[in-house]
Amino acid sequence: MAAGRAQVPSSEQAWLEDAQVFIQKTLCPAVKEPNVQLTPLIIDCVKTVWLSQGRNQGSTLPLSYSFVSVQDLKTHQRLPCCSHLSWSSSAYQAWAQEAGPNGNPLPREQLLLLGTLTDLSADLEQECRNGSLYVRDNTGVLSCELIDLDLSWLGHLFLFPCWSYLPPARWNSSGEGHLELWDAPVPVFPLTVSPGPVTPIPVLYPESASRLLRLRNKLRGVQRNLAGNLVRLSALVKSKQKAYFILSLGRSHPAVTHVSVIVQVPAQLVWHRVLRPGTAYVLTELRVSKIRGQRQHVWMTSQSSRLLLLKPECVQELELELEGPLLEADPKPLPTPSNSEDKKDPEGLARYSRLLSYSGAVTGVLNEPAGLYELDGQLGLCLAYQQFRGLRRVMRPGVCLQLQDVHLLQSVGGGTRRPVLAPCLRGAVLLQSFSRQKPGTHSSRQAYGASLYEQLVWERQLGLPLYLWATKALEELAGKLCPHVLRHHQFLQHSSPGSPSLGLQLLVPTLDLLAPPGSPVRNAHNEILEEPHHCPLQKYTRLQTPSSFPTLAALKEEGQREAWASFDPEALLPLPEASHLPSCQLNRHLAWSWLCLLPSAFHPAQVLLGVLVASSHKGCLQLRDQSGSLPCLLLAKHSQPLSDPRLIGCLVRAERFQLIVERDVRSSFPSWKELSMPGFIQKQQARVYVQFFLADALILPVPRPSLHSATPSTPQTDPTGPEGPHLGQSRLFLLCHKEALMKRNFCVPPGASPEVPKPVLSFCVLGSWLGGTQRKEGTGWGLPEPQGNDDKDQKVHLIFFGSSVRWFEFLHPGQVYRLVAPGPPTPMLFEKDGSSCISRRPLELAGCASCLTVQDNWTLELESSQDIQDVLDANKALPESSLTDLLSDNFTDSLVSFSAEILSRTLCEPLVASLWMKLGNTGTMRRCVKLTVALETAECEFPPHLDVYIEDPHLPPSLGLLPGARVHFSQLEKRVSRSHNVYCCFRSSTYVQVLSFPPETTISIPLPHIYLAELRQGGQSPFQATTSCHIVSVFSLQLFWVCAYCTSICRQGKCTRLGPTCPTQTAVSQAIIRLLVEDGTAEAVVTCRNHHVAAALGLCPREWASLLEFVRVPGRVVLQFAGPGAQLESSARVDKPMTMFLWTLCTSPSVLRPIVLSFELERKPSKIVPLEPPRLQRFQCGELPFLTHVNPRLRLSCLSIRESEYSSSLGILASSC
């Protein structure tokens, strides 16, 4: 026991010695009172607070507490903390529990803080005061916040018993922490209480002070004392010239008459922390002044003005003789805050906000740099229209605020659903209590951008609805691009003329449309003083969200969702056509389809945004953001491909684009009846990409320091490597031809692995060197090295594989490029023979002197200098084969080139083999894509059609080969089918260039209406047309039912195929009729199939269905009308009534009638067999025979049949349906 008692004094003694050392070092020089023992006073002060709650744990000193200086807090305290000297552990626990169930309370530290409370950040001039508070000791100054400030505390030494310290955020290395002083500080030295005035202070009340302002002859030299209730307190306005705030005094609250006072003396700005609305004050020695640009005079404080609490016994109202000419009319009464609903203007478009006062707690931080918070879990709070930099650091969940004269805006739109409170410069935001919670760990995008958000409000003059949308859009953009594409501080930096903000540039197109620049700048004095009140928050219009910036992954997912939601087999195959298709044709029609989505298809409209990268794995361009990548097809403009590699790494923003979704479906529908059953879809996948013109996009370079090191998928294109910009060599070449991007085999170089090489994705180009090698000289290139054979065309074969595949989309024939090899010069670098990679024979045939493999670290640059302009002009045109060469049997050159518009794209059977064997997947069907194109030629009015086939290894086809697109094909292989039709196929040398995208809106162009005789004009006649004609006779009629699986004839609904039973016993009906028609100029044989047969026979759907049901039993009925009567062919016995019915029908006026026929030629324009010449035919006219040349009949395929306007409905059986 004795030893224990002896330890206590020694512990206290050690604590007292440490305290004395700390006080002498940290506080003594700062004390101005002479001959005072500072240490005992501080110790007594600490003891008083320590013992104030009756706590005595065996010692009168807080031995567990240690003194801390300002410098120690700033240097060593890296985590938020709080210290409560007079609290026990249970008291702290109760305090911490009030932080809320989801709150993270401030941890407690046992620290003693002393310092001088001041409004000077250092020993500076008085003019540097800006209304901020600081705690200062010998080691430094720390900013602080105090809720209930007494002006008599300034400049005195205090012990702070309850406080919290919040260090700067980790991302803010240049920032400083701050103190939050919870309770009133305890003075170390007794504060002198100033005695009241000996005589009452003569004061003016608001009514008299207001009238005095309007007297012309009594304005000069007037200094008066004003008294009244504080009815309004503006925000603290800080401009480049000065800082100030404006308060209004009235007789009562709310006041009928008020008078405004401007406080702009630096030493008096701290009054803003003292003033509380509803409290009565006296302001002494005020003078009258006039604000520049204002008509009225106002009261303004002087250097000697003081702020006092109004005590009725200490003041006396000053009686004045208010006579003289008035400068202006009586001011309007101070408007009271409105509690009514938002008012609307007569047009119903604009709304007017409500002014009110509100007290509440911050429950969430929505966007701290933008000044957006959540109040009481149901209101939004926007502080952006005030200068709230000092308030921002204390704003976190748990802070209680009092809002004076704040605007309430409801239904602002722009993606915001909750009502929003927003104070303008007239209102005030006052702290009522600090938060018990630790600051949240904000992501970088929630930490940067305060100056940019201020720029949106103060320079762009955005209204609140548009500002809320802009902040949300910037958050979306930061989430898309940061931090992997660029740093948050780069993206959200303040925009200046020499350094524009990347974030703001992305919003400018939308902001310029909704809020054009040039709006009047906010006038703070007018906003605070003018009646009626005008500010950016007073009047607003509900904003329909103009656009959004989805991530590329979200855009891709939305495109797939829309594509599969709209995938309807019954809509892709209309019922009249689908009901006659066998299973194989039915599923092949559904195997490929596509959907084009425009930005307007989304709500709100989508804006495409991403960094342009070139993929070395797929050889295509991609847009990339944080969520992933999306393939893209870009054209500089119509018929002009993308050819400048400098675009790699740039940020691309496009409001006009096409989101393409190609749907690949593997299905096994037995027949059209099961199209509504999704269970027959075995596999479905989609290819999603975007296509747009660069002319419709905004291209922004990304700051270089933000780009990460190159990866194989996104290599850098900057030729200035680690060796610096002064090392490297290059050579110009003219690109003559580019081959297809596909997997190729290359010879194994000597010394390589003995394993069998696998085909690699690659492509080759054929070009011509333009001059010799050039070396880097400064920022440019030196003169070309002389060549021994300058006059000879030096052709070169360049091979691209590996990472160099990324250049595929930028290389186009007719352009001049610079091939750049970084690093120290290497002799003969571009003259090395690469024959080990390719056989010499193809090079000799192409006339190439050498073959060169492009290395992974080499780069390409588009050359467009004036020196090579003649070369560009001479090679600008794309190669085109003549129509004669295309549609002829001349195979001197089987490679053809042409431009065409794609009419259709379908999947079909392979041209050569129907099956291919694949390891582990025997019997998998090969796919072949058929493009039907309309040739672009000036040689004929109606362009001929041609089929282009794409097979492995050119599958899947390149991006953009869609119906409606214009495409240039180079070096397709021309072939002739067994039916003498010309078609083309892809080969390894084929080059495809998309010239234009499918039109956004499809315009249905009616077929031309012609006479049949016009079809004999060869190339001048259309392939498809409409004519008005008359059915002369029926040549033949076939009605049959076939198995939907194997297409064999079905009798009584059963397949007649010999062999294994078909997996499905489903039959479909088919029909063919051949008609002879004439229109007075010529006659033609027309073949109609399936549902067109019903139209030709004039049968309604019910009659047609009944007729087909009669045919189901025999399975097949064939009628030939070669002469008089009808000859019957059938696979089973058919009753004579059916034969008689069909014969009667086909020879009746119901069929032999005038019609409007839409048709296409059975003979394709690509058929190279010469036309049948006119034949000599004998005619009998009475007893005299005649011989004449008769043209062969035209052969047409029916597209549709419509009844002629001149048809008589009496003889048409369909009229009864």
Swiss-Prot record:
Residues 327-346 are annotated as: Disordered. One of its GO terms (cellular component) is nucleus. The keyword DNA-binding applies. It holds the Pfam family CTC1. It comes from the Eukaryota. It is found in: Nucleus; Chromosome, Telomere. Its main location: nucleus. The keyword Glycosyltransferase does not apply. Keywords: Chromosome, DNA-binding, Nucleus, Telomere. GO terms for biological process: positive regulation of DNA replication; telomere maintenance via telomere lengthening. GO terms for molecular function: single-stranded DNA binding; telomeric DNA binding. Component of the CST complex proposed to act as a specialized replication factor promoting DNA replication under conditions of replication stress or natural replication barriers such as the telomere duplex. The CST complex binds single-stranded DNA with high affinity in a sequence-independent manner, while isolated subunits bind DNA with low affinity by themselves. Initially the CST complex has been proposed to protect telomeres from DNA degradation. However, the CST complex has been shown to be involved in several aspects of telomere replication. Belongs to the CTC1 family. PANTHER family: CST COMPLEX SUBUNIT CTC1 (PTHR14865:SF2). Component of the CST complex, composed of TEN1/C17orf106, CTC1/C17orf68 and STN1; in the complex interacts directly with STN1. Interacts with ACD and POT1. This is CST complex subunit CTC1.
